Regions:
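Acyltransferase donor/substrate-recognition loop-hinge adjacent to the catalytic core
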Residues: 3-6, 150-228
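TRNA-binding/sensing appendages of the translation machinery
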Residues: 2-45, 113
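A conserved beta-strand-loop-helix scaffold within acyl/acetyltransferase catalytic domains
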Residues: 24-65, 73-83, 210-301
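Short beta-strand-to-coil "C-cap" segments at the C-terminal boundary of structured domains/repeats
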Residues: 176-178, 362-366
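Acyl-donor binding region in acyl/amide transferases
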Residues: 83-164, 283-349
Length: 366
């Protein structure tokens, strides 16, 4: 069999960005259900127009085999992350590839890793970066994952292992059935937190813009030493979340208040599969996966001084009860690092069980 001609290019044109951003439509073309990328936002990031790029050095790479685009990845130096953690860690984001392209992917990885090494990075991570990258699924390959999470093909793991990456962290995704019995327990959790002097308000009740700013500040404080996190700013979060004000996000997301001050926050979304997922006609989603019946708690945090009063549980419970009022039958609790036992115990107390597993990869350089 004739060898294919492999070519690796740095992407630096509008047409190139467009082609880069649309590769997932080939990778997942045969899937019954998947989350397509926001092509416009991805092009803004690649071209340096997104606010977050003020903190990044970013270079997208594309792999071509016999002239056909078959794989992509972006090499990133996130200065804000490295300053926060005092590390020299590079990131590989946007990774997607077609099947049976081992040679092209190997060449792509080496080109991107060399780019990071030349910028002084001593390690590379793929599969976790705040607002930039999410971990790789290791099960449920044929199913629609929770909102924001990857539903990658299984062969991606061979690509990373062949590129000498190792698993750095595991993560889990939870799902809770919103049964009448568990709803009673949720109300008890809320009452217990209220008895300590805490109040829980939806973002709509708190004021949506004020809630966005509170969420930003609380998340920065609560996640300050959380693996993989880096600080974010109100200026970059506001334009991302303000468009959600007219949606159910305002009713499902919560702010925990103690002594008049916001000390806890939950960001939750309704079932977005009907609006954002790419679904093959005539194939229904399982109710615990979507189809209008699965909300998701995406982020939860409580500042250290307000912990140990059950506020995280109570905010999640309030969010899940709001989902019930809007006809949702299942709630996701997404995404928890394997060894984050406080958050895992919170999920379990809410009646949730692990329904998806994910990993983040790392490779030392050179």
């Amino acid at each position: 069999m004739a060898l294919r001609k492999i070519r690796i290019e740095q992407v630096n044109s509008r047409d190139g960005f467009e082609q880069f951003a649309r590769l997932p439509f080939q990778v997942y073309a045969e899937r019954d259900a998947w989350w397509p990328p926001d092509v416009h936002n991805e092009i803004d990031l690649l071209s340096g127009r997104a606010l977050i790029t003020a903190h990044l050095d970013l270079c997208p790479f594309a792999a071509f085999s016999d002239g056909r685009l078959v794989a992509r990845v972006s090499a990133v130096v996130n200065h804000r992350y490295n300053e926060h953690w005092k590390e020299k860690l590079g990131q590989l984001i946007h990774f997607e590839a077609l099947a049976d392209e081992e040679d092209a992917v190997a060449a792509l990885m080496e080109e991107a890793l060399t780019w990071l090494e030349r910028r002084g990075m001593n390690a590379a991570r793929s599969g976790f970066a705040a607002f930039l990258d999410y971990p790789y699924a290791i099960d449920n390959y044929a199913e629609l994952p929770s909102f924001l999470l990857r539903g990658n093909p299984d062969f991606y793991h061979r690509y990373f292992k062949n590129a000498r990456f190792a698993t750095e962290k595991g993560q889990v995704d939870y799902t809770a059935p919103l049964t009448p019995e568990i709803q009673t327990r949720y109300r008890q959790m809320i009452e217990a937190a209220q008895a300590t002097g805490a109040a829980i308000k939806s973002w709509r009740e708190f004021g949506f813009l004020a809630a966005i700013d509170a969420w930003t500040d609380i998340t920065n404080a609560a996640f300050d030493r959380h693996w993989g996190w880096n600080p974010i700013t109100r200026a970059e979060v506001r334009p991302m979340l303000l468009p959600l004000q007219p949606t159910l996000v305002a009713d499902l997301s919560m702010i925990g208040v103690v002594d008049g001050q916001p000390v806890g926050a939950v960001f939750s979304v309704p079932d977005l599969s009907g609006q954002l997922a790419r679904l093959r006609g005539g194939i229904p989603l399982p109710p615990e996966r979507g189809g209008g019946t699965r909300g998701a708690l995406v982020n939860i945090g409580v500042i250290e001084a307000a912990r140990s009063r059950g506020l995280a549980r109570a905010m999640a419970a309030q969010s899940f009860l709001a989902m019930v009022r809007h006809q949702m039958r299942f709630a996701g609790y997404t995404l928890v690092i394997d060894d984050n036992w406080p958050s895992r115990r919170t999920a379990e107390s809410l009646g949730a069980r692990v329904t998806g597993n994910f990993v983040t990869y790392r490779r030392d350089l050179p």
